[in-house]
């Protein structure tokens, strides 16, 4: 029996060593909010209220705290692109976000702000500024296009699209979004159908944070079956902590399968 197991290991190793490699892994962040999102908080231990109240001068001190070269505050805040960035506070906030992404070696980022695409170009420019002024970093993140839509049924739909589709996405948002804070008056099923028709990847964000899988949820059984049908749902995302990773994942899969 031992000889048989060794034979299996030998064959497995041979197949593994001879297998052609078709790609490589890249550190990716597929759900990122930027300072244009109404509930943005900059740091995980902050609140959105704290971020709204903090001043550009305080952010300047944080940004340059550990830097060897410190740019004069007046010069720093007078040189940003006022067409792209709405204020000096927004400008330095995006620089801080871009630097954090680069420092953490994240190569691909999908911007998914709440009900708006305004943060994409701002983050792209912020990344370019950091890379130009701080050449110590060797990773230039690719910023991809996305949006997180707050649906009328209280679900959030993340959509990831190509640059060429941005005009269609922005037109849809202008016609179907009440406000960036309130979201859309359309239900998630309508949103998913619209974006599927444009061949735009979409999915329910952090769907295990809702009660939709439980009996007595605000959505009917027929509606849920339609949402999770093959033609509407191809992907789904979860909020998982290390503590409950395995149990939550198994629970969610069982609920979908059974």
From Swiss-Prot:
InterPro entries: Pol/histidinol_Pase-like (IPR016195). Disruption phenotype: Strains with a pezT/SP_1052/SP_1053 disruption have partially attenuated virulence, they take longer to develop a terminal infection in mice, although they grow normally in liquid culture. A double SP_1052/SP_1053 disruption grows almost as well as wild-type, showing the effect is mostly due to disruption of pezT. Induction: In S.pneumoniae strain 0100993 is found in the pezT/SP_1052/SP_1053 operon. This is Uncharacterized protein SP_1052. The lineage of its organism: Bacteria, Bacillati, Bacillota, Bacilli, Lactobacillales.
């Amino acid at each position: 029996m031992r000889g048989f197991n060794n034979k299996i290991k030998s064959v497995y190793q041979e197949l593994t060593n001879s297998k052609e490699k078709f790609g490589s892994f890249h550190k990716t962040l597929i759900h990122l909010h930027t300072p244009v999102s109404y509930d943005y908080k900059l740091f995980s231990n902050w609140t959105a209220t704290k971020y709204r109240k903090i001043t550009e001068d305080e952010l300047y001190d944080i940004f340059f705290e550990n830097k060897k070269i410190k740019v004069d505050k007046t010069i720093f805040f007078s040189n940003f692109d006022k067409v792209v960035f709405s204020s000096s506070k927004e400008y330095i906030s995006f620089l801080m976000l871009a630097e954090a992404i680069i420092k953490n070696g994240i190569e691909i980022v999908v911007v998914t702000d709440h009900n708006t695409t305004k943060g994409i170009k701002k983050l792209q420019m912020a990344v370019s500024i950091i890379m130009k002024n701080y050449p110590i970093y060797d990773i230039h993140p690719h910023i991809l296009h996305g949006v997180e839509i707050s649906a009328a049924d209280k679900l959030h739909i993340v959509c990831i699209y190509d640059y060429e589709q941005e005009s269609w996405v922005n037109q849809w948002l202008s016609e179907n979004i009440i406000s960036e804070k309130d979201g859309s008056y359309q239900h998630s099923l309508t949103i998913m159908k619209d974006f599927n028709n444009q061949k735009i990847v979409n999915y329910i964000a952090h769907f295990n944070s809702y009660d939709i899988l439980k009996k007595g949820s605000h959505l009917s059984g027929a509606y849920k079956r339609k949402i999770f049908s093959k033609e509407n749902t191809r992907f789904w995302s979860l909020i998982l902590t290390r503590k409950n990773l395995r149990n939550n994942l198994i629970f969610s899969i069982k609920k979908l399968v059974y």
